[in-house]
Amino acid sequence: MLGISLFIRPMLGFMLLSTACSSAADDHAAADQPLTTAQTKPEKSGKKGKKGSHKKDKAEAQANGLRRVGKLTDGILESSGLCAAPEAGTYFTFGDDGQQPTVWRVDGTGQQVDQFTLGAPNHDWESLSRDPSGNYYMGDCGNNGSDRQNLAILRFRPAAPGQVGKINFKYPDQTEFPPNKKERNFDCEASLWHDGQVYLFTKDRATQNTCKVYAVPDQPGNYTAKAVTKLTIPGEVTDATLAPDGHRLVLLARQELFVLDGNSWADILKATPRHISLQGAGQTEGAAFKDQNTLLITTEQGDVYELDL
């Protein structure tokens, strides 16, 4: 069983009212293939950029309950995140680490519908979430070497992508850039909006065992992120998404994911994560709920999968 240890007082147990980008539209009915969960401890994940290090037969991914439903349109390179778009049945995706500041809108099979340019550079975009008012929050906080000092969340509306508000932040417990290799847990590829805050989930490059959770306000400004909790996650988290009813958090990692259930945000952050293997899927980077029980997953190689939870 995977434990969770809080390093600050837990947040009050309020009911979730979030629509983290995870809250996706109902574009297809859930398919009927069963889900198979892993029965053993997950393997350690590889470092980003080693695309071939986890290449497996697609049949193995299908055995784990994944259904390959499509391929991202050519030209959409190294999809790094996924988020429901305002238009039903469509999703936003984007590249990372110095690519053009382009956001693509695709359908549930990965085919491009349209695209727009965001009015801010792509230092290392890694995640995208939204609030109930239609604001989107792009996490420009990829930090492979734990040495960046220009971390930001980019707030925008798709109808006016040239107008970007910057939520600049720093971590309260980082004093060296970079820190010692054993302390490099300041890379962040997963974030989501909830109740006026943008929550950040780190990717532990040091021990691949601890996901630190921070929060910053959802308004533009300069902030020191608030340390919220530490989650024992034996993998490197690549995306985060919240179910439409707000009672289930999914943390995606490399060829695996972790599910945390609860009746409140505080309960979710104290829940024991349930591990699901995605072995054979490739470098899984983006996740968004298609409906309450179906997850859409994209890989850096461009594959699009569905998974019943």
Question: What function would you assign to each model-found segment?
Answer:
Residues 22-24, 28-309:
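Sequence/structural signature of beta-propeller domains
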Residues 2-26:
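Sec-dependent N-terminal signal peptides
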